[in-house]
């Protein structure tokens, strides 16, 4: 598998060794130990093997200006999304208000920084809408909708995350626009985590997505074979 990635076997192996060398345990991070780091890294290479010919979004500006991405807020305001998300606060006041809300009302939203870019590929919107509908139909009463914690990122932003100590690898399915992270741990309080896990794993078994258990959130990457079908689904749903 590693030989089929853009870095090749040697490059992927060297990257993994470097990541192991720089690893620092931190209970706030999804990578709990070196074993988890190796597992998550290797499974995430499936993404870049699948999409090895796809160009990455190198800068924040490219993400903001890409015609391949749609504005989630525009869709949300028209009730066209079947999942929730929140944007990253851009000010100190906003971050403080977010932290206070988490303490006072922990059931309102998961403990996540939110999306830097409220943009996504049309096919990813269709996938997440489909998962969201299925989850709502099978989750216990009172469980909130599917919650998306990460979507498209630029390589520029990925480097910023690395500087903060996160396991943000390059290349990445997020930088190609074909990956998303969905909240898992928060749904324990509603008795819905196992339901969501089984729905995601069923899609993995069907070959629709790659799924990586990262602890608090699970990482999803769309399989290339599903792209055409989900593009048609999006166009039908949005009456394009």
Role assignments for model-derived ranges:
Residues 126-129, 133, 159, 194:
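Solvent-exposed, polar/charged alpha-helical surfaces in well-ordered, non-transmembrane soluble domains
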Residues 1-128, 213-215, 223-240:
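Extracytoplasmic cell-surface/polysaccharide-interacting catalytic and binding patches
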Residues 155-170:
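Charged, often glycine-rich, active-site loop that binds/positions anionic groups
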Residues 167-240:
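Catalytic cores and adjacent binding grooves of peptidoglycan-active enzymes
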Residues 115-116, 132-136, 165-169:
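Short secondary-structure capping micro-motifs at structural edges
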Residues 131-139, 186, 204:
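Sec/Tat-exported extracytoplasmic proteins
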């Amino acid at each position: 598998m590693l030989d089929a990635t853009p870095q090749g076997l040697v490059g992927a192996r060297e990257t993994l060794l470097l990541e192991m060398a720089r690893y620092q345990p931190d209970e706030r991070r999804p990578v709990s130990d070196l074993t988890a780091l190796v597992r998550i890294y290797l499974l995430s290479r499936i993404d870049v093997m699948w999409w090895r010919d796809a160009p990455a979004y190198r800068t924040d500006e490219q993400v903001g200006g890409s015609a391949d991405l749609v504005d989630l807020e525009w869709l949300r305001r028209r009730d066209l999304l079947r999942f929730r998300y929140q944007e990253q606060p851009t000010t100190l006041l906003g971050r403080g208000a977010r932290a206070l809300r988490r303490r006072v009302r922990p059931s309102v939203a998961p403990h996540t920084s939110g999306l830097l870019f409220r943009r996504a590929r049309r096919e990813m919107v269709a996938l997440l809408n489909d998962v969201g509908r299925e989850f709502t139909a099978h989750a216990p009463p009172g469980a909130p909708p599917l919650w998306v914690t990460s979507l498209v990122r630029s390589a520029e932003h990925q480097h910023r995350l690395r500087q903060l100590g996160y396991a943000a690898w390059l290349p990445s399915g997020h930088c190609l626009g074909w990956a998303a992270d969905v909240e898992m741990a928060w749904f324990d309080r509603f008795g819905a985590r196992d339901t969501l896990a089984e729905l995601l794993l069923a899609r993995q078994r069907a070959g629709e997505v790659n799924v990586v258990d990262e602890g608090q959130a699970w990482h999803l990457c769309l399989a290339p074979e599903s792209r055409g079908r989900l593009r048609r689904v999006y166009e039908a749903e949005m009456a394009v």
